[in-house]
Amino acid sequence: MVLSVSNKQGFINQSEQFEDRIIASEDTSNYKIVHKNDFAYNPARINVGSIARLTTIEMGIVSPMYICFRVRKGVVSEYLEHFFSTSYFFYEMQKRLEGSVRQCLSFESICNIPIYIPSSEEQHTIGKKISVLLDKIDIETHYHCKLVEQKHYLLRQMFI
């Protein structure tokens, strides 16, 4: 399956991102293979959040323009995934972007961003707590949307 990295949804099927046209080359022999828990990013689009960890399928391929990597032993993928969504990472990334029109972030530059790596156990704990909080935010956001819908419905019923 040919994948793309979306800044909103992470890894997605390329046909979903580019519904109206076929982007993938007929010859995918030079495409990069990504496995579950691997990361990939578009070096020219990372400044808008186009970096993701593959979690939904076991394996796929991405365009050769993507930079793909997996974490070394002792680093928990979920912990690093949350790190990439922090304002600290964004700030450090902005300092390392290269180019004037199309700013890019090389793999060497991303590796030079300082990151605190606690023990694996603590990384798991931090990652799980952040995930629980993000899930709670999603639930509360959905609940809020339903309350707004209900309010609009009730207001319409009052003035029929």
Each model region followed by its residue ranges:
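Amphipathic alpha-helical coiled-coil/heptad-repeat segments
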Residues: 117-160
